[in-house]
């Protein structure tokens, strides 16, 4: 049986990573909206549905950014 070393949970850059993820998701929404005029009706519906899910993800990531920033401020992330 092999022994695995436990790596400490380094969350020091979570806020920055989440901010990058939000920005990338926003860019994906913008790019997909540019493609709407070239898409069939079925594809347009799929794009709209996917963008709705993307917006929900953005909201969740922003909530997590807030939580991580608060934790950092309170000294949990040094």
Curated annotation (Swiss-Prot):
Claim: Manganese is one of the keywords in the record: no
Location of the protein in the cell: Spore core
Keyword RNA-binding tagged: no
Renumbered residue ranges of the record's region Disordered: 32-78
Keyword entries, A-Z: Sporulation
NCBIfam families recorded: SASP_tlp
Protein family (similarity comment): Belongs to the Tlp family.
Name of this protein: Small, acid-soluble spore protein Tlp
